[in-house]
Design a protein with these regions (language model features):
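Alpha/beta enzyme core
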Residues: 1-152, 158, 162, 166-169, ...
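Extended, intrinsically disordered, low-complexity segments
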Residues: 157-215
Length: 215
């Protein structure tokens, strides 16, 4: 699932974005109802567009997709400014124009997710990002109130960022990375994750075939 923010422009840009995502093999996107100059969903003073404008964004996305299985998630940031009831009303309007599911941003409690599922049977996404407004609910807690998809958007990034900071500070201090080797992923482990040897084998076969054809 790719975050396309507010769609990166008007209807034409949204259509182009969806086409590019499908061509790249993306399975799903989420598009939101903040104004174009948006901010982080867990920061104060967010501003949202009208229901009609968000519906136009969704219509452009839905009309542009060629693959029926391509999933378009409508994200709403309305909870902070309009409250749970208005946010749920908005979601109903988004689903009417073809959204496949709802991304309910910056929920404060499990009851808010439960309230949503009382109204709709469509898939519901919970964004469980660290250090934000939403508590770090467990997968079981979320499943029990009807959440279908859980997003951990920055979990690995935050760990990697802190690790990188510590590593480069260590190199500055010691002048070498040698003391850090035991906490690193080895070349062999990386190749295994990437299935690199299989790729290399295919590349060798391709070169061999090309050489045969040219000789």
């Amino acid at each position: 699932m790719v975050d396309i923010d507010t769609g990166w422009g008007g209807s034409e840009e949204i259509s182009n974005t969806i086409a590019e995502m499908e061509n790249a093999g993306v399975a799903a996107v989420h598009i939101e109802d903040q104004v174009y100059d948006k901010r982080c969903g867990h920061r104060p003073n967010k501003q949202i567009v009208s229901v009609a404008e968000m519906q136009d964004r969704l219509k452009a996305a839905v009309d542009a997709k060629k693959d029926e299985s391509f999933f378009i998630m409508a994200r709403t940031d309305a909870l902070a400014s309009e409250g749970i009831e208005k946010a749920i009303e908005r979601c109903g309007e988004y689903l009417k124009v073809g959204a496949d599911g709802i991304f309910f941003e910056a929920a404060l409690s499990l009851d808010e997710y439960k309230e949503f599922k009382k109204n709709f049977s469509f898939p519901l996404l919970a964004n469980i990002t660290e250090f934000g407004k939403t508590p770090l609910f467990t997968q079981k807690e979320l499943s029990d109130v009807g959440v279908d998809i859980v997003l951990y958007p920055l979990t690995a990034f935050r760990a990697m960022s802190l690790s990188a900071e510590k590593i480069y500070n260590s190199i500055i201090k010691d002048g070498t990375q040698e003391p850090l080797l035991d906490i690193m992923q080895t070349r062999e482990e990386l190749y295994e994750v990437l299935d690199y040897y299989n790729f290399e084998k295919q590349l060798d076969e391709q070169f061999e075939n090309n050489n045969k054809e040219s000789s």
